[in-house]
Amino acid sequence: GLPTCGETCFGGTCNTPGCTCDPWPVCTHN
């Protein structure tokens, strides 16, 4: 879930590889 990927995901998806939209709306490395 952390650290953050420097990307937001209001649409529910992250473009950064290896990152998930959790906690919404912040992309974090899973």
Curated annotation (Swiss-Prot):
Crosslinked residue numbers (Cyclopeptide (Gly-Asn)): 1-30
InterPro entries referenced in this protein's UniProt entry, alphabetically: Cyclotide, Cyclotide_moebius_CS, Cyclotide_sf
Keyword Disulfide bond: yes
Biological processes, Gene Ontology terms: defense response; killing of cells of another organism
SUPFAM superfamilies, A to Z: Cyclotides
Tissue/organ expression: Expressed in leaves but not in petals, petioles, roots and runners (at protein level).
Domain of life: Eukaryota
Keywords for the protein's UniProt record, in alphabetical order: Cytolysis, Disulfide bond, Hemolysis, Knottin, Plant defense
Cysteine pairs bridged by disulfides in the record: 5-19, 9-21, 14-27
Keyword Transmembrane found: no
Entry comment on modification after translation: This is a cyclic peptide.
Biological function: Probably participates in a plant defense mechanism. Has hemolytic activity.
Domain free text: The presence of a 'disulfide through disulfide knot' structurally defines this protein as a knottin.
Family indicated by similarity: Belongs to the cyclotide family. Moebius subfamily.
Protein name per Swiss-Prot or TrEMBL: Cycloviolacin-O24
